């Protein structure tokens, strides 16, 4: 996942501590660290980085933002604005945010965006087993063998996918609940079994679902949803 970075002296200045020029002097004096490394003039930091001055962590004066988007087909989940149809240009949000994870260009559905680097790491860390649910339509009839094999695990990308919940919706459609996020995982799993995905929609991330968000639109998470999300990830590893 790509993240937008800013200059370290701007980050320090934005805390209200001092000017950028004064921040550079602090950096040159060896008093600033990024994570566990002594900073150097010209360094840049992302939202997941931690910055320390004389051993004390500096916190940017930024209000946390949490957005749920019903991503339309064709939008690319990257912060790289050189990429056509990137999600940042699509939202055209006034402040710096980035997506939590990805949905590939031809998929649609729920994706969260934020400026909170800590929560991004906790949700995305593979060992945290957070559920994501999808509704998938394929090109031919779904049989019992397909459902059982998908649920048990499929060899892709030099590994075997984790066991997961798979339920049939109709002749060509199924629901699947994953606790990992390999690249194009569902499409690769289906291709291994000689099925082609015709439509893929993410409908849920943990207990946050897409209900009430029209296709292509977004809303802020409610205060109760944010509190719930914090509770869900409080024991997650960063």
Feature annotation, model-predicted:
Residues 1-238:
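Basic, flexible Lys/Arg- and Gly-enriched helix-loop patches that mediate nucleic-acid binding at interfaces
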């Amino acid at each position: 996942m790509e993240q937008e970075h800013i200059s370290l002296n701007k980050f320090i200045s934005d805390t209200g501590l001092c000017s950028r020029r004064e921040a550079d002097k602090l950096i040159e004096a060896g008093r600033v660290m990024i994570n566990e490394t002594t900073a150097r003039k010209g360094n840049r930091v992302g939202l997941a980085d931690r910055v320390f001055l004389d051993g004390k962590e500096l916190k940017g004066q930024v209000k946390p933002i949490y957005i749920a988007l019903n991503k339309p087909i064709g939008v690319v989940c990257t912060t790289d604005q050189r990429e056509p149809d990137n999600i940042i240009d699509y939202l055209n949000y006034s402040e710096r945010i980035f997506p939590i994870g990805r949905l590939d260009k031809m998929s649609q559905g729920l994706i969260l965006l934020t400026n909170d680097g800590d929560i991004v790491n906790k949700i995305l860390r593979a060992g945290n087993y957070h559920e994501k649910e999808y509704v998938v339509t394929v090109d031919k009839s779904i049989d019992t063998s397909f459902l059982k094999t998908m649920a048990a695990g499929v060899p892709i990308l030099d590994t075997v996918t984790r066991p997961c919940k798979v339920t049939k919706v109709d002749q060509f459609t199924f629901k699947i609940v994953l606790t990992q996020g390999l690249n194009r995982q569902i499409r690769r799993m289906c291709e291994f079994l000689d099925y082609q995905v015709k439509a893929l929609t993410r409908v849920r991330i943990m207990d946050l679902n897409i209900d009430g968000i029209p296709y292509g639109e977004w809303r802020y998470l409610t205060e109760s949803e944010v509190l719930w999300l914090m509770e869900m990830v409080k024991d997650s590893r960063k």
